[in-house]
Amino acid sequence: MTSHVMPTAERKVRVDLAERSYDILIGPGLIAAAGKEIASRLKGRKMAVITDENVAPRYLEPLMASLGESGIEAVSLILPAGEKTKSFEHLIPVCEAILGARIERNDAVIALGGGVIGDLTGFAAGIVRRGSRFIQIPTSLLAQVDSSVGGKTGINSAHGKNLIGVFHQPDLVLADTAALDTLSPREFRAGYAEVAKYGLIDKPEFFEWLEKNWQAVFAGGPARIEAIAVSCQAKADVVAADERENGRRALLNLGHTFGHALEAATDYDSKRLVHGEGVAIGMVLAHEFSARMNLASPDDARRVEAHLKTVGLPTRLADIPGALPPADRLMEAIAQDKKVKGGKLTFILTRGIGQSFVADDVPSSEVLSFLTEKHPR
């Protein structure tokens, strides 16, 4: 695979959005260097740090120390960990913490954690004072390569995932790759699903590279940094071209229409299914459905499933512990998805590995028939 970024120990990816452009820094030691990096970019010297009970014991103290060394005064709020934290119940305390810290125009809110903390904190920053500065310090692989980049923020609803939120771009993303060393194997695998997604969207050579080098990515070191940097560059390019998801950005949702429905069907119970696992199953289903519609070869679907299964990800509905609702109930969840326009189902389908496209008129009857075959119970 041809490298898409400079061959240095620390990588920098620029998200080009005119006056709202920002940097993504990728490499080890960035939490300890956060104060210096933030102080060099922002004039404000007051910060509110939002994190969760899993991340705080490891990284809150080093972050607060780094901020203090750079003359930044910070307060912190520690929330429960897990997908259910993305709710109105926890949004209000975050907003109050930001206001209580007297965060002003040049100050910032810092999200220290995975995708849940980033999405929730970004939403709060987007609505407090009609928009506060916001810094992402993602500590999970999924957050580093996906949710921390691009400005999508939000919380879940009883009607579905991420249905309440705003676009609010961060001012800086610090992806400390050393933080990934403390992830559980399951968490890392879940994030890897989003890495593989970029290859499946439009970078077949990257997917092939992952097939050959995934063990090195899991082990850490240069291959891991390379995979994260390529993923961030891929997302940055898409976001720069289509920030508000009016066209090309929708491709980033490959696997997510099925995946979000499965997350809702399991009541966001992380013991049964986490987001990246839902995406993995969703990407296999998207390739299988594309083959069913005679858009792609069944061999491509088998290849995608084989790779995701090799790294230890679930790839079939039967891999999800416990009972799932019937196919018609899954269809109801799909119909609530944000990728529905004019009552017509919009899916990201594929013509082959790295040849994904937006299909905005998918017959619901075909999807229901497909799901019934895959999940006859």
UniProtKB/Swiss-Prot annotation:
Catalytic activity: 7-phospho-2-dehydro-3-deoxy-D-arabino-heptonate = 3-dehydroquinate + phosphate
List of residues binding Zn(2+): E194, H256, H275
Pathway(s) annotated for this protein in UniProt: Metabolic intermediate biosynthesis; chorismate biosynthesis; chorismate from D-erythrose 4-phosphate and phosphoenolpyruvate: step 2/7
Residues binding NAD(+): G115, V116, I117, G118, D119, T139, S140, K152, K161
Short name of one Pfam family: DHQS_C
Swiss-Prot/TrEMBL cofactor(s): NAD(+); Co(2+); Zn(2+)
Entry keyword annotation includes Nucleotide-binding: yes
Compartments it resides in: Cytoplasm
Keyword match Metal-binding: yes
UniProt record, GO biological process: amino acid biosynthetic process; aromatic amino acid family biosynthetic process; chorismate biosynthetic process
UniProt xrefs under Gene3D superfamilies: 3.40.50.1970, Dehydroquinate synthase-like - alpha domain
Cofactor binding remark: Binds 1 divalent metal cation per subunit. Can use either Co(2+) or Zn(2+).
E.C. number: 4.2.3.4
Entry's Gene Ontology cellular component terms: cytoplasm
Keywords: Amino-acid biosynthesis, Aromatic amino acid biosynthesis, Cobalt, Cytoplasm, Lyase, Metal-binding, NAD, Nucleotide-binding, Zinc
Role this protein plays: Catalyzes the conversion of 3-deoxy-D-arabino-heptulosonate 7-phosphate (DAHP) to dehydroquinate (DHQ).
PANTHER family per the UniProt record, alphabetical: 3-DEHYDROQUINATE SYNTHASE, 3-DEHYDROQUINATE SYNTHASE, CHLOROPLASTIC
Record NCBIfam families: aroB
Similarity comment text for this entry: Belongs to the sugar phosphate cyclases superfamily. Dehydroquinate synthase family.
HAMAP family per the UniProt record, alphabetical: DHQ_synthase
Stated name of the protein: 3-dehydroquinate synthase
Encoding gene (name): aroB
